[in-house]
Amino acid sequence: MIGTATVSVHEGVVVHTTLDPVQQPFLDHHRIDGTPVLPGVMGMEAFAEAATLLVPELSVLGIDDVEFLAPVKFFRDEARTLRVQAVVVPDGDGFVARCSLSTDRMLPGHETPQRTVHFTGRVLLGAAAPEAERGDVPAAPTSPAMSADEVYSFYFHGPAYRVVAAAWRSGDTSVAVLTDPLIPDREPPDRPLCIAPRLVELCFQTAGLWQAGLEDRLALPMAVEHARFVPGRALDPAGVVHAIATERAPGVFDCVVVDAEGEVVVRLDGYRTIPLPGPVPAAAASALHATFRR
């Protein structure tokens, strides 16, 4: 996600990177109504990568106050240049980077390019690993579960973002198991990541299935209050990986991702969604209702 970078006293780190949906699976496989759209989780990854440019010795411990303000669309499958800004300031024993992702383009009636801010957030950087958090590894479902084919019969995600292998209800939570193996989501495929964006995506989709099953509506990401990552483990979790999402208020979810040993490798608190107009397709409703309504 990092292209050319400049540093200044007033603007901090500013990165310009050009992305092409023809080349990048995370765009080609993330289309809404046929148009590639930058996944919110890759915007978060861009924040993390930009924030660490000035303090590469520190780890990304979390990202707070993420706002998905406007989608980044790649019309006609054409490449676009993104501008990622990170202003890094001391914060206790670490640093905080105030980040934004924007684009510039010419619009009718204007003589100069107009800037749109799409995403904002704050990256938390530190040397000390967070205290280990344990969670319960979900048991195998005893009630109906949705298969990947059923999930992606109505979810718009292409192969690289089909992160749900199966999903079911457990009490008052939505549970999903991570697809294994995942196919490459970026080019080059071995380019390092900071925050395991597809584990965050697993949380988004797990919460979305709960809403779709109970409310008959699809929803898109709107905000994340707090996201926490275990450095190292989040990028290489052990064994079978599950996401467990709990709705704590209408359209507001907390979610954890646990590995096979029960370690919480990713935690999202206060993930908020915005519903799309129109109901879930009728063909998918029966499987959703059988799984999540009881």
What do these predicted regions represent?
Residues 1-294:
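Acyl-thioester-processing domains in fatty-acid/polyketide/NRPS systems
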